[in-house]
Amino acid sequence: MEGFWVSWLGLPGLRSHPRLFLTGMMDGPRSDVGRWGGNPLQPPTTPSPEPEPEPDRRFRRGGGRSFWARCCGCCSCRNVADDDWGPEPSDSRGRGSSSGTRRPGSRGSDSRQPVSRGSGVNAAGDGTIREGMLVVTGVDLLSSRSDQNRQEHHTDEYEYDELIVRRGQPFRMLLLLSRTYESSDRITLELLIGNNPEVGKGTHVIIPVGKGGSGGWKAQVTKASGQTLNLRVHTSPNAIIGKFQFTVRTQSDAGEFQLPFDPRNEIYILFNPWCPEDIVYVDHEDWRQEYVLNESGRIYYGTEAQIGERTWNYGQFDHGVLDACLYILDRRGMPYGGRGDPVSVSRVISAMVNSLDDNGVLIGNWSGDYSRGTNPSAWVGSVEILLSYLRTGYSVPYGQCWVFAGVTTTVLRCLGLATRTVTNFNSAHDTDTSLTMDIYFDENMKPLEHLNHDSVWNFHVWNDCWMKRPDLPSGFDGWQVVDATPQETSSGIFCCGPCSVESIKNGLVYMKYDTPFIFAEVNSDKVYWQRQDDGSFKIVYVEEKAIGTLIVTKAIGSNMREDITYLYKHPEGSDAERKAVETAAAHGSKPNVYANRGSAEDVAMQVEAQDAVMGQDLMVSVMLTNHSSSRRTVKLHLYLSVTFYTGVTGTIFKETKKEVELAPGASDRVTMPVAYKEYRPHLVDQGAMLLNVSGHVKESGQVLAKQHTFRLRTPDLSLTLLGAAVVGQECEVQIVFKNPLPVTLTNVVFRLEGSGLQRPKILNVGDIGGNETVTLRQTFVPVRPGPRQLIASLDSPQLSQVHGVIQVDVAPAPGDRGFFSDAGDDSHLGETIPMASRGGA
């Protein structure tokens, strides 16, 4: 039956995705709200062969909508796209005008584009130019980064020659005419996007000069001087974003003329956080500078007690990145009519940054085996990833949460959405929609791993983007969570958000999109269940402050860390916070979980781990305090295992048991030393370990349970700039690294990247001996002036998560030429560094 529908609807490629098709056709409103039972994480997939591009149909005008388009309301929607995009579309590379490829040699230089000239066509279509006809002999879109357009629209940093503007804001252009402009002449500007532009969908925009257009579009003559016409063009604050074809029509007594399409006259239109009429408007200039224009940022990882930070090169203005971002929308087959809606666009991006369902940008891999790609810890920015996807059409291996989030920040900032990268420490992954983290133990309080499907990630990274939510009741505008890491499905697709942070804070899990899942990540409780003699399970302990313990992002205007936990949840333990948790849990799969709470506690337990560098011995300890007026006997059991940052644990490699006698009001500490040789064979990514502590108080029957995650720190790379940095002039940087391990690091790879400084560069340095120090020197040529950041990383099978950064203040070139012409040089990708040039010490 499924095959019949596929054939009848004429949907190529749908046969291989019957589940997605049936989900889109049959899922009810419940699936629109959140992730009510999805697929588990899938293993890394092999990229599919690059599909052959279809013939270019961008100039097609006529024709009706297809049967599928007539059935699907989202294909003609102007402002709000459907949240279910149905089956995976066929590849649309090379078909539309929203992404496309750039002409050879276009590297974002600051030279002004020559005006376009063409014979044009008259009304008869025979190319004859009659005497007296008003012919457009050239167009100057004033697209140079030094021109007023790019400066006023805050797009002067994009390494592109074409005009890039933000919607809802006027721009200027010049028309060169064959004769003097007369009041009886009529001039019409036209913008077209997509394969089948239609006025009703907003994909064919007609702007009569001197008259008001529809939806906020208009054009005015500001100056007429001889055969030159100065125009001021106003775009709609609700305009579709993308790359538009541009043409001009004229009409006079002598006939009509149309300027031919010219790739040099294509216009990019983006969202506009500076425009009050745009629903992405941000009313703080310092926010816009940070969340739209900043090309680098900090991403936080590790554990709450041992926070690590790394600098990430977003590179949203680098040559080719804007085309890659628009290609992502094309590849998903997103209807052009929905591309003016940031809710729909951000939801598509959350689906397309991961490769599941739709062969998106990044392949997720949490296995620890990255031999067929790049270790997620080795990436230093988004540029290399996005350009690879644009160039090949293949999903890029591999990513984990911070990589997905870093790429998402790049894409959304590039398209004009104020976006930041957010880290949640002790982030829950609720698999059964109970909105609680359920941990099961046997009669002796040993974890039952086969039942523990819920997990708590040491940290999880996602994105906040700023927009109004006209699809929700009032009060839910502002920051919206978008999460591109594929964890659970939403409406049958691996995507998440946008979800109002305000709805998360108050436990309003019925608000779309995906609020139940995100609420559980930040504000669920840990519920400990113990197996009884009859095989049933009983709640023995509820840990209320274990999830979402710290939520942070980079501070505005500095590299400091900003605590934004208060935006996501009320103060822990407050009446408002408890009400939010219980409201959310009432909508989950275990609504009565709080009906039977445990007895009072009089013995407190605190778990600690020594802050150690990888390669050192360490110590873990448990502090017990008796708050009662009677003696207490505590039987304690400690289990130590390694853990992935996702909460997936390895086998227990060390444990100890202890019985402690506590006098009234007394405290005692239980310690367990751990040697490097004990944990070395078991280490996995991030160097994290999980200490499970369980026990009970003999006299009162109180159950003690605690899970404590900690990590081993890795060293940083030391970067030093050798000399001044000037646009267009070679500069040198020194990188120093000391191996902290007593073992040899093999197949060591360095990565170097920085927007405006260095295109992504890979350096293969071979082996580094145990405790050896190496020094590398690398040259680069800055291409843009101003404060920049050069970022480096090191990766090897024995050690990862090693990185460093240096601030580089680049002076303008003599004569202030702006962009240097070699902005897109990729010639150093994959360089092998000879041993003699490493400067080993």
Range-by-range predicted roles:
Residues 28-29, 381-518:
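Hydrophobic/aromatic-rich core segments of domains that either
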Residues 145-191, 228, 612-624, 633, ...:
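Contiguous beta-strand segments within globular domains
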Residues 179, 183-186, 190-295:
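Extended acidic/polar, glycine-enriched regions
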Residues 184, 630-634, 742-747:
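Short acidic/proline- and small/hydrophobic-mixed sequence motifs that coincide with surface turns
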Residues 237-245, 678-690, 784-791:
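Short glycine/proline/serine/threonine-rich loop/turn segments at secondary-structure transition edges
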Residues 253-299, 699-729, 801-826, 830-831:
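Short beta-strand elements
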Residues 276-422, 426, 430:
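Secondary-structure boundary elements
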Residues 652-681, 759-783:
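Intrinsically disordered, low-complexity Pro/Gly/Ser/Thr-rich segments with frequent PxxP/GP/PP motifs
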